[in-house]
Curated annotation (Swiss-Prot):
Coiled coil regions in record: none
Single GO MF descriptor: enzyme binding
Topology of this chain in the membrane: Single-pass type I membrane protein; Single-pass membrane protein
Residue ranges crossing the lipid bilayer per the database entry: 61-81
Cellular compartments annotated: Cytoplasmic vesicle membrane; Late endosome membrane; Lysosome membrane
Annotated region described as Disordered, given as residue ranges: 102-153
Cytoplasmic-facing ranges: 82-172
Originating organism: Pongo abelii (Sumatran orangutan)
Entry function: Increases the transcriptional activity of NFKB1 by facilitating its nuclear translocation, DNA-binding and associated apoptotic response, when overexpressed. May sequester WWOX in lysosomal vesicles and thereby regulate WWOX role as tumor suppressor.
Signal peptide: 1-22
Entry similarity comment: Belongs to the VOPP1/ECOP family.
Biased composition (Pro residues): 104-119
Record protein name field: WW domain binding protein VOPP1
Any single GO CC term annotated in Swiss-Prot or TrEMBL for this entry: lysosomal membrane
């Protein structure tokens, strides 16, 4: 007799768990009227009173997001590790020569010089900059040192390699 109340309590507890378990209320139309049925929480409704156990991984968007982020991270890390372990070979560049050009000497006062008209002599050919304050600001006087000085040639040591360290230290 003592076992009977334990069985009844277990049965009532099982019924209570069955009733309180999360369930899905599903419905479908049969003719013109809806028909209702219940599926468990881990099942999906499929219509016509059937419940399908669904693998809910397709509904876990965060799982797919983290999976894609992990794949991208691994690919990026592999790329950087490969670049560090096997660096690309250095390409030898051809010797870089710098050539200097001299400005031609100033021609006579009547010859036209190339360049924008505002930078010419006010009495020479070109536009008259009287009404233009910007042209007046950038105009050079006719006998200014900036307009008539030719650049000197570059020093001779520019095209040679630097002297050795010992020679420089001994010179001091």
């Amino acid at each position: 007799m003592r076992r009977q109340p334990a069985k009844v309590a277990a049965l009532l507890l099982g019924l209570l768990l069955e009733c309180t378990e999360a369930k899905k209320h599903c419905w479908y139309f049969e003719g013109l009227y809806p028909t209702y049925y219940i599926c468990r929480s881990y099942e999906d409704c499929c219509g016509s009173r059937c419940c399908v156990r669904a693998l809910s991984i397709q509904r876990l968007w965060y799982f797919w997001f983290l999976l894609m982020m992990g794949v991208l991270f691994c690919c990026g890390a592999g790329f950087f590790i490969r670049r560090r372990m096997y660096p690309p070979p250095l390409i030898e560049e051809p010797a870089f020569n710098v050539s200097y050009t001299r400005q031609p000497p100033n021609p006579g006062p009547g010859a036209q010089q190339p360049g924008p008209p505002y930078y010419t002599d006010p009495g020479g050919p070109g536009m008259n900059p009287v009404g233009n304050s910007m042209a007046m600001a950038f105009q050079l006087p006719p006998n200014s040192p900036q307009g008539s000085v030719a650049c000197p040639p570059p020093p001779a040591y520019c095209n040679t390699p630097p002297p050795p360290y010992e020679q420089v230290v001994k010179a001091k």
